[in-house]
């Protein structure tokens, strides 16, 4: 019996990726459009530094929600977003009201990131790629709007609301789908009680199963952080591109969608390509144009995230019957993203 692919579920998981990215997009809009320097005002500091800090805080937060009532959260998010953009456009207390609305909405939008991971990552692995692809598509769309200065027009925030709406429709389809229900059943032990309906590994059990991958992820992070510090200090590749560099800091959420073949060998291949791009930037600053150096920087980041994606895939395979695997993967992604973001931001300020 051959496996069939549900194309409606593919579209739904792709849309769910749009919804999951809403918190990152929200932070991106304020950090790039409403902020010109991370140390200019306290509002700018808030917009730029909120993403790594909130990601670190979210690791320690437990979220339990009734999926059928999340429509109220959607209305709240859209209402706050609309009020924020209107306040900014009409210059209504933008120094106090807008930052306050930003924080409230950012924290509540993080709930979508958590619940979307929890639902989609219990479905078969093929749907993970479309979820991550939707996440990446949302970030790319907003990046293009910024690149072509469409944010200066009257429709500058339309994509945010569109992604939220279609994302919620897709999310509602996914959590009601049989694939999600079967995914939860896969995590049930043969014998279970009321208190232990699902297999839930402890932190020590996870460390025992996925220790090698976690060590590799840590060493890749250290290498990438050291590389970014070196490039900030000894090259000008990051000069003037902080607006667009922001998106490279959250690649652990979505770059796995572009990987065709994932293995330890491919982890090594991606790492070598990333290292090569780093040395080309560092040593060939006078041989390449500004655009070419920016392209090499993009290659360096994407290959790094692809190497991480291969390792995260191996962790998911090893822990496929663990009910908390989706949240564990999300926590690892948030930790890696936040530490890299903090490293780059501090390096830019200290040079």
Curated annotation (Swiss-Prot):
Q: Which UniProt keywords apply?
A: Host membrane, Membrane, Transmembrane, Transmembrane helix
- According to its UniProt record, where is this protein located? Host membrane
Provide the Gene Ontology terms for cellular component.
Answer: host cell membrane; membrane
So which domain of life are we looking at? Viruses
Membrane topology annotation: Multi-pass membrane protein
Pfam families (alphabetical): Herpes_BMRF2
Q: Which InterPro entries match?
A: Herpes_BMRF2
Chief location bin:
host cell
Residue ranges spanning the membrane: these are 14-34, 43-63, 70-90, 97-117, 133-153, 155-175, 214-234, 240-260, 268-288, 293-313, 328-348
Question: Family assignment?
Answer: Belongs to the herpesviridae BMRF2 family.
UniProt name for this protein: Gene 58 protein
Species of origin reads Alcelaphine herpesvirus 1 (strain C500) (AlHV-1)
The gene name reads: 58
């Amino acid at each position: 019996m051959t496996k069939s692919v549900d194309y409606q579920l593919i579209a739904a998981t792709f849309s769910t990726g749009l919804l999951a990215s809403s918190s990152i997009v929200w932070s991106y809009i304020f950090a790039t459009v409403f902020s010109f320097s991370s140390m200019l005002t306290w509002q700018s500091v808030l917009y730029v530094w909120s993403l790594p800090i909130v990601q670190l805080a979210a690791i320690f937060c437990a979220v339990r929600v009734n999926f059928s009532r999340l429509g109220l959260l959607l209305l709240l998010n859209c209402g706050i977003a609309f009020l924020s953009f209107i306040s900014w456009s009409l210059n209504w207390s933008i120094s106090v009201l807008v930052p306050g609305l930003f924080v409230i909405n950012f924290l509540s939008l993080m709930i979508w990131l958590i619940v979307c991971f929890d639902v989609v990552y219990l479905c078969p692995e093929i749907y993970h790629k479309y979820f991550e692809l939707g996440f990446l598509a949302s970030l790319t769309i907003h990046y293009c709007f910024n690149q072509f200065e469409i944010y200066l027009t009257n429709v500058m925030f339309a994509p945010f609301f569109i992604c939220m709406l279609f994302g919620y429709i897709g999310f509602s389809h996914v959590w009601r789908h049989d694939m999600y229900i079967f995914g939860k059943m896969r995590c049930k032990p043969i014998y279970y009680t009321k208190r232990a309906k699902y297999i839930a590994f402890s932190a020590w059990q996870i460390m025992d199963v996925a220790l090698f991958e976690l060590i590799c992820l840590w060493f890749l992070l250290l290498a990438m952080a050291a590389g970014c510090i070196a490039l900030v200090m000894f090259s000008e590749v990051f000069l003037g591109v902080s607006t667009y560099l922001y998106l490279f800091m959250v690649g652990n959420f979505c770059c796995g969608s572009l990987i065709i073949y994932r293995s330890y060998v491919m982890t090594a291949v991606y790492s070598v390509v990333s290292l090569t791009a780093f040395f080309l930037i560092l040593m060939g600053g006078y041989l390449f144009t500004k655009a070419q150096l920016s392209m090499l920087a993009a290659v360096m980041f994407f290959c790094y995230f692809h190497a991480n994606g291969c390792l995260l895939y191996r962790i998911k395979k090893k822990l496929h019957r663990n009910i908390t695997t989706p949240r564990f993967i999300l926590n690892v992604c948030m930790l890696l993203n936040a530490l890299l973001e903090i490293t780059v931001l501090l390096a830019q300020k200290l040079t």
